[in-house]
Design a protein with these regions (language model features):
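N-terminal signal peptide c-region/cleavage motif recognized by signal peptidases
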Residues: 20-21
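Extracytoplasmic small-molecule ligand-binding "clamshell" domains
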Residues: 26-109, 113-117, 197
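Beta->alpha turn/N-cap motifs
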Residues: 41-46, 86-91, 100-112, 135-136, ...
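Periplasmic-binding protein-like
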Residues: 43-45, 126-141, 220-267, 286-302
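Ligand-binding cleft/hinge of the Venus flytrap
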Residues: 51-54, 66-82, 141-151, 158-167, ...
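Extended ligand-binding regions for polar small-molecule ligands
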Residues: 59-71, 136-159, 165-169, 245-287
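Acidic, polar ligand-binding/catalytic clefts
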Residues: 78-162, 235-242, 298-299
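A ligand-binding cleft/hinge motif common to bilobed small-molecule-binding domains
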Residues: 91-92, 106-118, 181-188, 206-244
Length: 302
């Protein structure tokens, strides 16, 4: 009997774990059903994706989540489902999802492997492009490399480029994926330039306008939006070049397959709908051929 006790204890523990797993996996759906509330986090100051207040949130991602909520009301048979918006910071948004404080985040959240260590992601709904903003009167030593999409290669070019770029300072949004990207590029090019981490996109643009840094890297659409709204936007230049492209998706709790499936199904239906396509066109204009192809790739058949 004694010899079998460890085996029995192990089997009991295994059964208890197995019994607990389904409950955990269904946690978000159970919470949404029980509370009749979908709690949506968003990062203010990230226009055109998310902006405003909890009472009046706005932006493409926020409105997309509104359409998602309508679809989930039907899909989950929850006609009384309410949407509650909660402002978050970039630093705290993934933790809020992982801890169940919000059900997802309606902002431009890039889907990366590092972030997947903390949360899961829905199907993509947008492809974000990392761009840069500089002053229009920036010197050629800065404008030339950031404007060129396909640049010359070789030790002579690299030495010349680095010598010019080393004179300049750069900024990125703190806790964003741009930080790791910028550090990686600076290491690869052997740059000794200053890299500043700012608290908001608005601050990043402001210090470029004031000449405190030479360039600020962020999502290109966000930069264009801020340039259009800034009284001194005419002094700024946002080149067409994209330095990095990544899928944007809704962060979800890890290990919650039922909730992820529900969100993916609703999101696919929203993107395929007339309302979803009209929403995209209102914020970004009629999608080009490449954008249409990406939208089709993002969707899944039911």
């Amino acid at each position: 009997m004694i010899a079998f006790q460890p085996l029995l204890r192990g089997a009991t523990a295994l059964l208890l774990t197995a019994a607990l797993l389904p409950a955990y996996a269904a946690d978000t759906l159970q919470r949404v059903r029980a509370s009749q509330t979908l709690t949506l986090g968003f990062v203010p100051g990230d226009a055109p994706f998310s902006a405003g207040t909890p009472e009046q949130p706005s932006g493409y991602a926020v409105e997309l989540c509104g359409l998602l909520g309508e679809q989930l009301r039907q899909q989950l048979n929850l006609p009384a489902l309410q949407l509650r918006y909660q402002p978050l910071t970039v630093a705290g948004m993934l933790g809020a999802v992982a801890e169940g404080k919000v059900d997802t985040v309606c902002s431009a959240v890039g889907d990366t492997l590092t972030r997947r260590e903390q949360v899961s992601f829905s199907l993509p709904y947008f492809a974000a492009g990392l761009g840069v903003v500089v002053r229009r009167d920036a010197p050629a030593s800065l404008l030339t490399p950031i404007n060129e999409g396909a640049q010359p290669r070789g030790p002579v070019w690299r030495a010349t480029l680095n010598q010019g770029l080393n004179r300049h300072s750069f900024a990125v949004l703190k806790d964003s994926v741009s930080v790791d990207w910028a550090r990686s590029r600076m290491r690869a090019l052997g740059l000794q330039s200053e890299l500043h981490e700012v608290a908001s996109n608005a601050e990043g643009l402001a210090i470029v306008v004031e000449g405190q840094v030479d360039a600020f890297f962020a999502d290109r659409l966000v930069l264009l939006n801020y340039q259009a709204e800034n009284p001194r936007g005419h002094e700024l230049l946002v080149p067409e070049r994209l330095f990095e492209v990544m899928p944007v998706a809704l962060p979800l709790a890890r290990g919650d397959a039922d909730w992820q499936l529900a969100v993916d199904r609703a999101l696919s239906q929203v993107q395929h709908s007339e309302a979803g396509q009209a929403l995209y066109a209102r914020y970004f204009g009629a999608p080009g051929e490449q954008s249409q192809l990406l939208m089709k790739l993002f969707q899944r058949p039911d």
